[in-house]
Amino acid sequence: VRKTTLKNGLRLIYEKREANISSFCIGIDAGALREEDGFLFGTAHALEHMLYKGTKSRSEDDINRLSDEIFGFSNAMTNYPYVIYYGTTLAVSFEKGLDLYSDIILNPSLKKDGFSEEMKIIEEELREWADDLPQLCEDKLFRNCFKSRRIKERIIGSQDTVAALDVDELRRFYEKFYIPQNSVISVVTSQSFEETLMLVEKYFGGWGKGKELCLSTLYEENKAGTYIDNACNMEGVKIEYCFTLHGLTPDEEKAVSLFNFHFGGSVTSMLYDEIRTKRGLAYEISSKVRKENGLKLLTIYANTSRENVDRVTGIIDCIIEGIRSGKAYNPDMKQIERAEDMLKLRRELFLEKSKQ
């Protein structure tokens, strides 16, 4: 892996891989977290949609046609910490792919034409979001347990905030955060580093620097409590716990990840063993460390039946109390080393998958 930074501040991460395909991902620190700086919730996601509506030299139809001609797969995604644009092409079409996406990101038209139609699409996405029951459970949890953090509200905003958006709001967000020093492009290709750098400079080197940003993220402790919501279209019960992890050192974050492997991050973990293996009370039971900027949480997720809710939550609470008292978690060095090996393996598998 090689890394460099262009004169305009854009960072390039390169990995050579002998294959007939090339992949790239353009990541920008312009996710939903940046809406904390005086923007309507849903602005980041709506802007991602609108970038595909046309550029100063290409129409939406042009973009769609070229996408079909160039890419085996391409997409975009807005999360709390970032927005990404990515695609995979044949090696011979890599330059064409970069050309198209540089135009999409650097030269969006952001016109009023087509804006209302795209907002209708996002309104449909909002309805589908509400039908995703695990996501709905998490939304309810974050909304109730945080007072001010951006994760209190959905990434895509609400019906009210989406309805209040306009092109000027999107343009203001774009001009502030879509700047090269706020961005990174990663490339996996059979081309040499020098060839790749030349192409990235050709298509992104002219991306003008914006105003230097001093970015920060709001964190706060969660409010303790139990929050219950009845969904009429729901057969079973979704359960989620969250614990804040912000403010940890890198060594402490590593320790939490090792702990989580034993707690709920594997099929031999305490939660999985007690709730699923021994008692068969839940189909899904796991815990996860979420290290992303703006999240910094440990979450527990369970999927069970209505009649087993109290038993499942009782076991979770009992395990947590045992850990706090020092009675339930005393791993030896062999167990810690095994957890470390498994986490390394998972990371390698994740990285391998992300390059495909």
Which role does the model predict for each range below?
Residues V1-D62, R171-E274, T313:
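His/Glu-rich zincin catalytic helix
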